């Protein structure tokens, strides 16, 4: 047994104990934390590794949904001052960057993803002075800021659109996609959020239709227009000049269109991404954006969505193409279904993406965000018995995979789905419009509500559960959306006091990843790949091999890692009771949702 505790879900396999001791002794991270856990480094970076010094490769990103994080002024809506008041909490997690959902001025049809003014702050959130204070507070604490850039579409209340729809001869007309009605009805395009799923909306003012892939209040911008592109680059420079550290390009894979609008085959809606993503001159626009803005500032860039193939994703983030830095692919998070999911499929998807990016490009690793229901409710088990171990197990997965981890606010507590049973309690435009569509077409509303309870985006947007006081300490007013009813038992204040809570386990995982570069750059190898219950893999780098074993089920499960365990050193376990020591036998039995 080592003279200092190693903290990792798995076993220390390769390299000698003396090697680990020597590396710990020589590490600049050697020291002690308040809970008596040693800090050290396994696998010092070889000379010249990550020589480009890109901070985002070793970053750990914490996503803050501002509307639901912390309300300062008592109006029931989270705001920038509320975030400022909780920066010390965020810093205490050990994360290194914050991704902030849109705070721009917006009529709020889609919770800020319908922007009416890209250079001003939504009044619900505060003022530009508040933003400047927030940014300074983050930088003072060593935290970087990544902002959402929503430029596939704008709000229909943006001045660009007001001018565009005013006249067919308006200089802003081509900022958007229009189809004149005398040409007949435009070829059908599917809308994700429209009540009728029709992406063309007729506008009588100029007797024409405008295109909206999302809600009818989110008209799509026409990136073929040079003047529009320059407007966007100027907006990016405005924020980069303020000192932000990165942009996440929301839905940008859909920005380029074939503006001849050919007819698509019947049923294309079921695979609309193949027809919408990575079309036209998208790469040309990104290369121009890089040349005009990204290359001139010390900012990172991440693409929401990664096209329809590994080649698409590589083309977005291949450094030699001078486009973006990081891919944010949804294949993994899209696996979860109300009836469950196959771990074999889960392993296959994440292994494929890791293999594809092992030597080229850079990936994000995540299982939840503002567009998903809660992590533990979708991929784990949110029952009282298994919520804590399964939430910890899933956190272990995210923090031990290759790529930049993104963690959504509240998931560090193991917050669960709210599971509202009345449509009136849902605020999401997509949920409300789809409910109305089901009602209009005679759909099964009972079944639809069950699907919402499992998968609605609003499950991930309920207020952050700070404590067990009124409104979970989120607001002194009436929250904009109902709280999850279990906030009295699942909250940050309670977990701060418990060294074995989800929150404190998350902090240990974050610190470990930061201190051990094998978890950032190490080779990933899938083990026991046909095991339907356990995800087993190694991370290997610079003479160090770490084994991670994750039971994804509510029953005990056995795994054969395919290697002798006699000399393995246990590092971390997500259970409150310690795991039994490994035996010389290859097979290892894991408790329900155990990470060991």
What label would you give each PLM region?
Residues 5-15:
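Bacterial N-terminal signal peptides
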Residues 21-596:
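Active-site and adjacent substrate-binding regions of carbohydrate-active enzymes
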Residues 1-3:
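Classical eukaryotic N-terminal signal peptides for Sec-dependent ER targeting/secretion
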């Amino acid at each position: 047994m080592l003279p200092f505790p190693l903290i990792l879900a798995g076993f220390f396999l390769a390299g000698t104990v003396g090697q680990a001791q020597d590396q710990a002794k020589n590490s600049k991270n050697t020291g002690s934390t308040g809970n008596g856990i040693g800090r050290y480094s396994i696998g010092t970076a070889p000379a010249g590794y990550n020589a480009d010094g890109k901070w985002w490769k070793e970053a750990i990103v914490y996503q803050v949904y501002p509307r639901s994080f912390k309300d300062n002024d008592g109006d029931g809506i989270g705001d920038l001052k509320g975030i400022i008041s909780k920066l010390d909490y965020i810093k205490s997690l050990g994360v290194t960057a914050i991704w902030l959902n849109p705070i721009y001025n917006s009529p709020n049809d889609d919770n800020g993803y319908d922007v009416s003014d890209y250079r001003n702050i939504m009044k619900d959130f505060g003022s530009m002075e508040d933003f400047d204070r927030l940014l300074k507070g983050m930088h003072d604490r060593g935290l970087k800021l990544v902002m959402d850039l929503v430029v596939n579409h704008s709000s229909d209340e943006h001045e660009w659109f007001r001018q565009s729809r005013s006249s067919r001869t308006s200089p802003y007309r081509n900022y958007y996609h229009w189809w004149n009605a005398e040409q007949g009805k435009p070829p059908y395009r599917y809308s994700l959020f429209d009540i009728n799923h029709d992406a063309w909306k007729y506008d009588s003012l100029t007797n024409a239709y405008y295109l909206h892939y999302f809600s009818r209040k989110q008209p799509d911008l026409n990136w073929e227009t040079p003047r529009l592109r320059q407007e966007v680059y100027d907006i990016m420079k405005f924020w980069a000049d303020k000192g932000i550290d990165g942009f996440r390009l929301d839905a940008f894979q859909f920005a380029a269109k074939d503006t001849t609008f050919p007819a698509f085959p019947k049923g294309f809606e079921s695979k609309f991404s193949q027809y919408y993503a990575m079309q036209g001159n998208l790469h040309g626009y990104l290369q121009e954006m890089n040349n005009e803005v990204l290359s001139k500032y010390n900012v990172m860039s991440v693409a929401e969505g990664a096209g329809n193939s590994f080649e698409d994703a590589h083309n977005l983030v291949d450094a030699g193409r001078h486009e973006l830095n990081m891919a944010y692919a949804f294949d993994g998070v899209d696996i979860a279904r109300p009836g469950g999911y196959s771990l074999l499929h889960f392993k296959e998807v994440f292994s494929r993406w890791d293999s594809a990016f092992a030597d080229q490009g850079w990936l994000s690793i995540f299982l939840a965000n503002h567009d998903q229901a809660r992590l533990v409710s979708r991929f784990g088990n949110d029952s009282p018995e298994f919520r804590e171990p399964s939430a910890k197990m899933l956190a272990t997965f995210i923090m031990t995979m290759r790529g930049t981890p993104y963690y959504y606010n509240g998931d560090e507590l193991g917050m669960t789905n709210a599971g509202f049973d009345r449509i009136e309690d849902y605020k999401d435009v997509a949920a409300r419009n789809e409910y109305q569509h089901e009602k209009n077409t005679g759909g099964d509303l009972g079944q639809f509500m069950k699907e919402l309870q499992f998968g609605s985006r609003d499950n991930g947007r309920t207020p952050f559960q700070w404590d067990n006081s009124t409104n979970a300490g989120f607001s002194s007013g009436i929250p904009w959306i109902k709280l999850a009813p279990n906030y009295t038992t699942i909250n940050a204040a309670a977990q701060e006091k418990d060294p074995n809570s989800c929150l404190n386990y998350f902090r240990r995982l974050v610190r470990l990843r930061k201190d051990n570069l094998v978890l950032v750059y190490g080779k990933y190898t899938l083990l026991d790949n046909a095991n339907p219950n356990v995800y087993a893999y190694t991370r290997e780098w610079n003479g160090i091999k770490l084994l991670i074993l994750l039971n994804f089920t509510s029953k005990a499960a056995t795994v054969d890692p395919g290697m002798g365990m006699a000399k393995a050193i246990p590092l971390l376990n997500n259970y409150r009771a310690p795991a039994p020591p490994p035996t010389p036998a290859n097979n290892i039995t894991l408790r329900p949702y155990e990470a060991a």
